[in-house]
Amino acid sequence: YEKYIIERIDSVLFQSYPIYELIILDDKSSDNSVEIIKKKIDDIKQKYPNLIVKFIPNEVNSGNVFKQWKKAFDESTGDYLWIAEADDSCSRKFLENIMKQFELDDKVVMSYSESLTMDENNKILMDDLREWIDIFKTGKWNNSFIDEGHDFCENFLCINNTIANVSSLVFKKDKNIDFDKYLIEATKYRLAGDWYFYEKVLMHGNIAYNKNSLNYHRMQSNSVTLTTKREKEYEEICSIQSDIINNYNLSKDMKQRLEDRKKSF
């Protein structure tokens, strides 16, 4: 992450929408990220004296990214939380647009934007992720929308994780949602805990989507899908889809689509 961490931090600091708290988590990086972050924080404190800045490095790798998510929720003091992953980036208008969607509907608990993908050298690979997300070619993501959480899960999120990258998303820390419980449960998943967490949160509110690619998701060219990883992913997908069936009112047709999707995997 050392190659991208400064760009990531700056992409947060340079937002057109004001931020009040910056929490940087490091999960025992094996590179020089900690030293780079410490030096950057000294600079931040001089330039942004009113910004609350926390740096929390782990002494031992947690082994599960969702433990870090939980720490972010535990440590943050604001009403909204943006988990900005270390190797991603974004438009400086990202937060401005995402936060507007909360203002349009006070029941929105998750607000996100479309994402483009880029490589290690910031070369754009895909202008958006609609081809990945909209597997049944519904056209759902061609326009911005606000959906009731249950409807979104029963018609879209039940099939696949339609929120491809957590960096594209801001959560409202609604006091009626037991984020702590759901994140502890999410840690039992190695690959699909984000999907599990989203469907749990959406039991309690609505979701908003901005069609513009305001989030920049970095794809690592050396990432490899191993057979064992594929098998684990399939196992977790089946588990999450079963949980959705138990907690949501899926139509007969949608349940059949779930079965067909499992077979194609």
Regions inferred by a protein language model and the residue ranges of each:
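Donor nucleotide-sugar binding loop of glycosyltransferases
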Residues: Y1-Y4, S29
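Acidic donor-binding segment of Leloir-type glycosyltransferases
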Residues: D10-P57
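Glycine-rich, basic loop-to-helix element that forms the pyrophosphate-binding segment
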Residues: P57-S76
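Short aromatic/hydrophobic "clamp" motif used to bind/position activated sugar donors
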Residues: L81
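The conserved acidic donor/metal-binding loop of glycosyltransferases
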Residues: E85-S89, E114
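Conserved nucleotide-sugar donor-binding catalytic segment
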Residues: C90, W132-R230
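Conserved donor NDP-sugar-binding/catalytic core segment of glycosyltransferases
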Residues: K93-I135
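Non-catalytic, C-terminal membrane-associated alpha-helical segments of glycosyltransferases
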Residues: K229-I237, K255-F265
